[in-house]
């Protein structure tokens, strides 16, 4: 499923601007993993490496219409898809009272 998403993402990058030229293209598939890289002359790029266990590490980046360089790195493994970027939303910090309550509960487990 992830490979389909990666291929569709690459196709969308290429289809976004018909006048974009490929600067670098690498697709090296081996029995123990793969390396894939695509660099376009408009600043868009994608790269990924995968191993025999299905773990994938990658990065994709582009220049937004506002001129902002967007970069997303990710890991896909037994814990699922884990993207990281300064532009991705993050949850608010856990309030101190909640952390204190969790610590109390862990220190005083139920006797049932």
Swiss-Prot record:
Component of the larval cuticle. Keywords: Cuticle, Signal. GO terms for cellular component: chitin-based extracellular matrix. PANTHER family: CUTICLE PROTEIN, CUTICULAR PROTEIN 65AU, ISOFORM A-RELATED. PROSITE patterns: CHIT_BIND_RR_1, CHIT_BIND_RR_2. GO terms for biological process: chitin-based cuticle development; larval chitin-based cuticle development. It comes from Drosophila melanogaster (Fruit fly). Coiled coil: none annotated. This is Larval cuticle protein 3. Residues 1-16 form the signal peptide. Residues 31-92 form the Chitin-binding type R&R domain. InterPro entries: CHIT_BIND_RR_consensus, Cuticle_Struct_Prot, Insect_cuticle. GO terms for molecular function: structural constituent of chitin-based larval cuticle.
């Amino acid at each position: 499923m992830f490979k389909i998403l990666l291929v569709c993402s690459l196709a969308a990058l290429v289809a976004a601007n018909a006048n974009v030229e490929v600067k670098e293209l690498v697709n090296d598939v081996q029995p123990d993993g793969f390396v894939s890289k695509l660099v376009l002359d408009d600043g868009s790029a994608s790269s990924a490496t995968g191993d025999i266990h299905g773990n994938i590490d990658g990065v994709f980046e582009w220049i937004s219409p506002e001129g902002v360089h967007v970069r997303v790195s990710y890991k896909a493994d037994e814990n699922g898809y884990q993207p990281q970027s300064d532009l991705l939303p993050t949850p608010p910090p856990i309030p101190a009272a909640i952390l204190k309550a969790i610590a109390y509960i862990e220190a005083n487990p139920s006797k049932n």
